[in-house]
Amino acid sequence: MKLKRLAALLLCAAVMLPLAACAKKPDSGTSRTSQTTDDTTVTPTKDGDTSITATDKGNKGAAAQDLMQGITKGKGASKKPDSRFANVAASFALDLFKDEYKSGKNTLISPLSVLTALAMTQNGAEGKTLSEMQKVLGGLDRDTLNAYMNAYLAELTGKDSALKCANSLWIDSRLDVKTSFLQKNADFYSAQAYKADFTRKNTVNEINSWVNKNTNGMIKKLVDEFDPLTVMVLMNALCLEAEWSDPYTDNCVSEGTFKNAKGNLVKAEYMYSQETEYIETENATGFVKYYKGDRFAFVALLPNEGTSIDSYIASLTGKGFLGALNSRKNTRVNTQMPKFKCEYSNSLVDTLKKMGMSTAFDGNRANFSSMATLKNENIYISDVIHKTFIEVAEKGTRAGAVTAVIAAKSAAMPVEQPKEVRHTRPFVYAIIDTRTNLPLFIGAQTDI
């Protein structure tokens, strides 16, 4: 059987994940009764659910239409993050970071953005596709993960928080989307859903505008164009703009040199300070610097002399990362850290396959039957793209991430000498949530 390629995309200003579809045998033709409004058709399905189909009605030039009009956001189950969730999320974060890191290259990911996008996507998965996704995401069943994420995202993005999060689904009129899929993503992730024609330039502009707006301009756009076979895009965007609790002053900044991963010396602007939390492990030292409000903090980890950045990153584990932060000491530490900016973009398909999530990318075997249906086509993930941005400077930090899933058819301190941590060579850094110590962003700076 000749298959038509159906592309799917996931974008995350931290990550992007695409869905796609391929041809399948027609079903038995069971009759269904539909109810149609001006913009959508609600149809009972064989499994007792309903599906929503966006209708064109001559609106090719109009703005994307809201598909959540008939869906009221409910109060989804909520489970306060605990040590079980922290261990699962930390393991996912560090495994993703290790597999994504390329030797000697600046790398930046947002595990939270990727986790959110994949958690939304797995609400539409079944069978082996679902079991593989659950394993990669830490082994929690999807209801438990939804409950944890519901509570965690609410905590992180509460009133006056420096972190903002937004989720949206963009759906082609060819797709019959399960109402239960939309409902779950509304209840647990406050996701919005819109009808979109991916062949229109206006749709590209609207989606890029959504990305730009929800990352405060840190990530300007997701794509230049979509494959004409695209049928859905699921997106998560994160934006953090935080000021240091103790900003660097002008007299604490001076020029110097940074020895990059290739051994070359390059010019850098360094920020100097004395911090009060010191990290020491068997192969690295580091410090913690807080942002205003103390909910978020910056962590910088420098491999010991004689330990390469590559071997240090290869040794990282979720358990070890949490352990290092949980055992940090209240000790004065003199720090030297370069100002830096990093923009990162990459496909996560190979990384996620390596982690054990392969069926979701297989046009013949993927099962997203709880997400949507498309006549004679099978939906699968065709790509996952991750986009991130960070800027660390005297006043604070700006960081952004966006994840999109695109579906298409295929078809009190002791008196002692201060410690010293000088980040004048490649290092690992993270922005953490100080209540769980989980990394919201994690990266490796190998060059300036």
Residue ranges: model-predicted function:
Residues 16, 58-72, 375-378, 384-389, ...:
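Non-catalytic interaction/Regulatory regions outside core domains
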